[in-house]
């Protein structure tokens, strides 16, 4: 039943495909190839104008995996250093080095990905305004056409909270963000989307910056809430949007992988809700 419902729900052509995060590139090249082959076989991507993969941690990226992404049509990836300060990377448990980040960016740009994003986080443990400035200034030399500047969000159950790691003050986070704005503008970047999360340091925000023409459509679709988003996988949240009637509904997949696998009836129910919603839109 789930497969039949899936086929009924994915007849519409996809405008933007996004596979994220987490870090999909923890999969092997063979696993990634099998997964993207299934995506291309089951979805109509003939009108797809954006194919984005979260490459995530630089220590999960190699030439073979990136070639698989290119072979399947990926035109946008994200490499997420978060920081280039060794003591910050150590404090947050990251295994990669600043040199790994530079090598990953060199590889991605040399292989010809049209768009590459880098994620940075202001307010990480052990960071300082000076360290954040060094990180941003260096990242601006790597050739990314998108840079997303996040503010640390202290999520419940996070290692930072559980271990009581000291974090920069709100004043220091403000100094980091105050530096980012003119530094990015000077290099031709402009902000194009903004959002807030709960428990953010200093009650600041996350801002996506890009070079003109390099905007990420999926990011815009999420922020505008004018487009339906069909989500697949454990923890996924499907958003159904009927802009004409000013109506939005959401359905959620089971969060944990084992629960997701053991509850196919929930997946069938969610897909039926998606199908019924779009039938009503067409009336």
Regions found by a protein language model. Name each.
Residues 29-38, 66, 70-74, 128-143, ...:
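Short, electropositive alpha-helical surface patch
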Residues 17-24, 150:
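Glycine-rich beta-strand-to-loop/alpha-helix junction loops that act as flexible
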Residues 1, 208-283:
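Radical SAM enzyme core and accessory elements
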Residues 90-96, 163-167:
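Short glycine-enriched, charge-decorated loop/helix-capping segments at active-site entrances
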Residues 72-78, 83, 99-163, 170-198, ...:
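Conserved C-terminal portion of the radical SAM core fold
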Residues 3-4, 24-68, 81-84, 96-100, ...:
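Canonical radical SAM enzyme core domain
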Residues 2-10:
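Single conserved hydrophobic/aromatic residue that forms the stacking wall/gate
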Residues 83-94, 144:
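Bacterial c-di-GMP phosphodiesterase catalytic domain signature
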């Amino acid at each position: 039943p789930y497969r039949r419902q899936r086929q009924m729900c994915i007849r519409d052509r996809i405008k933007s495909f996004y596979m994220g995060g987490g870090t999909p590139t923890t999969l092997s090249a063979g696993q990634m190839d099998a997964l993207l082959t299934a995506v291309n076989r089951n979805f109509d991507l003939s009108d797809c104008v954006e194919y984005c993969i979260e490459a995530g941690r630089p220590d999960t990226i190699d030439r073979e995996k990136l070639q698989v992404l290119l072979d399947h049509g990926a035109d946008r990836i994200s490499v997420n250093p978060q920081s280039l300060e060794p003591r910050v990377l150590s404090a947050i448990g990251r295994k990669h080095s600043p040199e790994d980040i530079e090598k990953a960016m060199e590889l991605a740009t040399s292989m010809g990905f049209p768009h590459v994003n880098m994620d940075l986080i202001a307010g990480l443990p052990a960071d300082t305004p000076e360290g954040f400035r060094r990180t941003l200034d260096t990242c601006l030399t790597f050739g990314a056409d998108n840079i997303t500047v996040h503010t640390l969000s202290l999520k419940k159950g996070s290692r930072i909270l559980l271990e009581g790691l000291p974090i920069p003050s709100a004043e220091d986070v403000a100094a980091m963000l105050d530096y980012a704005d003119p530094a990015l503008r000077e290099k031709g970047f402009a902000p194009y989307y903004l959002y807030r999360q709960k428990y953010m340091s200093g009650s600041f925000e996350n801002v996506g910056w890009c070079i003109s023409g390099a905007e990420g459509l999926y990011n815009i679709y999420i922020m505008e809430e004018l487009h339906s988003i069909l989500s697949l996988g454990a923890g996924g949240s499907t958003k159904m949007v009927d802009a004409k009637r000013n109506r939005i509904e959401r359905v959620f997949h089971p969060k944990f992988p084992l629960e997701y696998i053991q509850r196919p009836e929930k997946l069938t129910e969610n897909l039926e809700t998606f199908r019924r919603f779009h039938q009503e839109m067409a009336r």
